[in-house]
Amino acid sequence: MATHRQRNHRLCKTNYQPNFRREKRTMNYGLVSKQDARLYAEAVCDVIGHGKANAAVLLCVETAAAETLLGDYKDPTPTSAGTGLTQVDLGTFEWLRDKYKNSRYAPVLLNQFGIDLSRTVYEELRTSPLMAMLFCRLRYLTVSESIPATREARAAYWKKYYNTSAGKGTPQDYIDKCQRAGVDALFTQ
């Protein structure tokens, strides 16, 4: 039986069905295929916004590539350095949940996805690519600077606002991991 969240999930409303035969290798963080990461990012951005340069979907998918190679890399520390497909840390999760739980986005998220931000718990990000993409997009939504149009500029943007000076990643790591994870192929299919 589908849960309330699954029944009200926008991708379910559009008769989207994951193709379990699409990729034979095991994915992590609840992802069935890399293509599904793009679909979740698109669904989230359809609700939250695509940004002025219409680059939010690219940024979210590239962030997932930089953080987990789009689900290919399983973090050996499931919650200490971040969790889920986009590796959101606990402090950031709590800040974003509290910031947006009474925002204009809250009723839309509840209607489209069945997500009540005020009741969301951190552990959900670990196995829900939808939740991971949502919190990734919410993190970037807090930034007043527009999302850049090029991958190189988005790499610097990711480092400054997402990975920050506390993170080990570099803009070059972002670019390299996007290539390793096959991000370009997701947008040419």
Regions found by a protein language model. Give the residues of each.
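N-terminal export signals and maturation junctions of secreted/periplasmic proteins
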Residues: 4, 9, 15-47
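Peptidoglycan-targeting cell-wall enzymes and recognition modules
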Residues: 28-43, 65-144
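Cell wall/extracellular polymer interaction/catalysis modules
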Residues: 28-30, 48-59
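Alpha-helical scaffolds flanking conserved acidic
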Residues: 54-62, 151-158
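Secretory-pathway/luminal and periplasmic proteins that interact with or process carbohydrate-rich
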Residues: 67-75, 163-172
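C-terminal/domain-terminus segments
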Residues: 147-168
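Long, charge-rich low-complexity segments
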Residues: 172-189
